[in-house]
């Protein structure tokens, strides 16, 4: 069958309307789409089988997943009285992930990440695979028992602030403030329950597309935008309070403007720089331990 015939045959098999209700354009490549989807369908099938096995296997596993009641207590869908109650879905996802990635198991903070994914996708299996992409690929060692990746990136942020916002770095040094005291929840929860929902969703779009660099962009933008306010602090409790306040207000609520700012405010931020800082910060942390 020549290319023209294959294209015509594919056009007859593939619906003109896509699954989201949109009509496909005249120049849509039906043959390429069919070829891609036939390959992708194999991947989806393998994933579905894997998910099914994990879910069945979780019955015999006893895991310390203790944060369910503290996951979005203000969200009616996570309350025990809800029907259906998303606590059960969250439990399934976390338990299955503990089986899938036993080096990580369950780590505090993952409940918020998984819970958000469940709210977004409304699907256990999709939430599981997105969680795997975050924990296993995009943010390796963030949620491992030693949390070395998380600790490293907090130190990287400190170095970036030292490079780009020296006055803020001097304030921290002058008061002996550890950055983990200020930003650990930003990194652990990926801004969930810290920034407004719509803003977090926009950040996560970039996180899945561009990788972990986006976390530094968000953090640097928050600090730079409020630099004068932060520099008014005169004590450690005052600094901590100001870092809580900078995650509130119109600046973070207006997500479109905020997302534009995170790509302009921090200035140049190459992966080469981040990789170099990660290597030096990780080595320093390992030397300390």
From Swiss-Prot:
Q: Which GO terms describe its cellular component?
A: cytoplasm; plasma membrane
Top-level taxonomic group = Eukaryota
Signal: is it a keyword of this entry? no
One Pfam entry for this protein is RabGAP-TBC
Gene Ontology MF: a single term:
GTPase activator activity
Classification via InterPro entries: Rab-GAP-TBC_dom, Rab-GAP_TBC_sf, Rab_GAP_TBC_domain
Where does the record place the Rab-GAP TBC domain? 41-211
**Keywords, comma-separated and alphabetical:** GTPase activation
Its function?
A: May act as a GTPase-activating protein for Rab family protein(s).
Protein name per UniProt: Growth hormone-regulated TBC protein 1
Its source organism is: Rattus norvegicus (Rat)
User: Which gene produces this protein?
Assistant: Grtp1
């Amino acid at each position: 069958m020549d290319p023209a015939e294959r294209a015509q045959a594919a056009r007859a098999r593939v619906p003109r309307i896509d699954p989201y209700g949109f009509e496909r354009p005249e120049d849509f490549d039906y043959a390429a789409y069919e070829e891609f989807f036939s390959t992708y369908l194999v991947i989806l099938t393998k994933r579905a089988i894997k998910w099914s096995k994990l879910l069945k296997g979780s019955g015999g596993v006893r895991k310390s997943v203790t944060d369910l009641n503290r996951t979005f207590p203000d969200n009616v869908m996570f309350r025990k009285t809800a029907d259906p109650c998303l606590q059960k879905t969250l439990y399934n996802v976390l338990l299955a992930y503990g089986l899938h990635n036993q080096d990580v198991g369950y780590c505090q903070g993952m409940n918020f990440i998984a819970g958000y994914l469940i709210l977004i996708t409304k699907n256990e299996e999709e939430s599981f695979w997105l969680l795997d992409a975050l924990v296993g690929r995009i943010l390796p060692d963030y949620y491992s028992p030693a949390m070395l990746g998380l600790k490293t990136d907090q130190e990287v942020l400190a170095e970036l602030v030292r490079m780009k916002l020296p006055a803020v770095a001097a304030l921290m040094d002058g008061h002996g403030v550890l950055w983990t005291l200020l930003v650990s929840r930003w990194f652990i929860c990926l801004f969930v329950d810290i920034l407004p929902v719509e803003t977090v969703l926009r950040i996560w779009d970039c996180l899945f597309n561009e990788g972990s660099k986006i976390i530094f962009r968000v953090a640097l933008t928050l600090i730079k935008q409020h630099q004068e306010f932060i520099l008014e602090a005169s004590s450690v409790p005052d600094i901590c309070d100001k870092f809580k306040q900078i995650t509130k207000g119109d600046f973070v609520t207006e997500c479109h403007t905020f997302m534009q700012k995170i790509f302009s405010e921090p200035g140049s931020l190459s992966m080469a720089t981040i990789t170099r800082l990660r290597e030096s910060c990780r080595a320093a942390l390992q030397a300390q331990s």
